Design a protein with these regions (language model features):
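Glycine-rich, often acidic, oxyanion-interacting loops/wings at catalytic, nucleic-acid
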Residues: 130-220
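Charged, often Cys/His-bearing segments associated with DNA-binding zinc-finger transcription factors
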Residues: 1-10, 153, 341-342, 351
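Short alpha-helix plus adjacent loop in nuclease-associated cores
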Residues: 79-127, 168-170, 267-276, 280, ...
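Phosphate-backbone recognition surface of nucleic-acid-processing proteins
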Residues: 89, 95, 220-223, 229-317
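Extended, structured, electrostatic nucleic-acid-contact surfaces
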Residues: 2-10, 202-227, 235-241
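Low-complexity, acidic/Ser/Thr- and charged residue-rich accessory regions of DNA metabolism proteins
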Residues: 266, 306-351
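Glycine/alanine-rich phosphate-binding loops at beta-alpha junctions
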Residues: 1-79, 86-88
Length: 351
């Protein structure tokens, strides 16, 4: 069958993405293959420009948001399929065309959870968060290296960033009895790296805060307890308006903040949290939950105060933090979906 004829009868198209080449498989309404070809990445829009509107599944991954937006502009219904959801539909050995076929099969299933297409603004915001996260990791590595070098020479510093920052200048100035001139120079260089990383992190954090204040969605999210500019902007960058999740519990499950279920028959077995989905956003919600737990005097100011007070009497601190992070994530998703600020409704206590 010719490509032109195939294009006119394709009901569903699966696209396996590569750095330079995309592999296409088209299926008709009976599931038969009517299109099989590979296209250069730069020609995919022109190739599908004259194809009648159809369902297109594209492998979620590198640079797929741009391709998905371009194909959506042509009128196609484009969905990004995670590779893990397409894998069960692949038959035989793995190759690019079989992956494309698996994507075409998976995208037709109502149960397949697809990745929402991000806008340019979301990608920009996500990039800021990823750069900041990398810099924070580098700063932590530098600090740990300074501590380890000092400890090798018998100098132990109390745990905490503040104590190292306060004591390091005096150590370098006064402990030449145990630190050689070479080691002092090495640690001074590392201290300079630390300062430069601090400056870059502060600059990016300030930019994120400005963007968060300029976004209505972020401002509404920041009314949720424990949620500040970093969490709010990271959430908007990750899920947009939150319509990909039917319920708040679905968002919490996507973040991996629910127990892993291993049930059979009449036995319900719950294990540790799944830790699936967006690890960065999950970490931020956990940090927000721990900040709230540090201030028990303020618990009753929140609508979940009575629940939190009761849970604190029966749950381990880490389990309590996870449960609270789950609740905060569900509240945040509701705020995002309903496009309104969080309102704490606390029931008055009766005598």
């Amino acid at each position: 069958m010719s490509h032109k004829t195939a294009a006119t009868v394709a009901h569903t198209i699966g696209i396996d993405t590569g750095k330079n080449t995309l592999h296409l498989i088209g299926l008709d309404d009976q599931g038969a293959i009517v299109l099989r070809e590979n296209v250069a990445r730069g020609r995919i829009t022109a190739r599908l420009a004259n194809v009648p509107r159809c369902l297109i599944g594209i492998e979620a991954g590198m640079a797929t948001h741009y391709v998905a937006r371009e194909l959506s502009a042509l009128g196609h219904d484009v969905k990004q399929v995670p590779p893990a959801y397409a894998k069960p539909f692949r038959q035989g050995h793995k190759n690019d065309f079989r992956d494309a076929y698996a994507i075409a099969e998976a995208v037709q299933r109502p149960s397949t959870r697809c990745v929402p297409v991000k806008t340019d603004d979301q990608l920009d915001l996500q990039a800021l968060h990823r750069v900041r996260s990398r810099l924070v990791g580098q700063r932590t590595a530098v600090i740990n290296q300074i501590r380890s070098f000092l400890l090798e020479h018998g100098i132990a510093i109390r745990q905490g960033l503040r104590f190292l920052r306060q004591q390091l200048p005096d150590i370098l100035a006064k402990r030449s009895d145990v630190l050689s001139p070479r080691m002092i120079r090495i640690i001074e260089d590392l201290s300079g790296d630390w300062r430069r990383l601090d400056e870059r992190i502060e600059h990016i954090t300030a930019e994120i805060e400005v963007l968060a204040q300029g976004s209505e969605s972020c401002r509404q999210l920041m009314t949720v307890p424990g949620v500040g500019p970093i969490i709010a902007s990271a959430m908007v960058a990750a899920i947009g308006n939150g319509t990909a999740f039917a319920k708040g519990r679905d968002f919490a499950a996507w973040l991996g903040l629910i127990p892993k279920q291993m049930s059979t028959g009449d036995r319900t077995i719950l294990g540790r949290i799944t830790k699936r989905g967006n690890r960065y956003l999950r970490t931020l919600f956990m940090q927000g939950a721990r900040v709230i737990l540090l201030r028990p005097a303020n618990w009753m100011k929140h609508s979940f105060g009575p629940w939190l007070t009761a849970a604190a009497n029966r749950l381990h601190h880490n389990v309590l933090a996870t449960a609270l992070a789950n609740k905060l994530a569900r509240i945040a998703r509701t705020v995002l979906m309903q496009a309104r600020s969080y309102e704490a409704r606390v029931e008055p206590r009766t005598a």
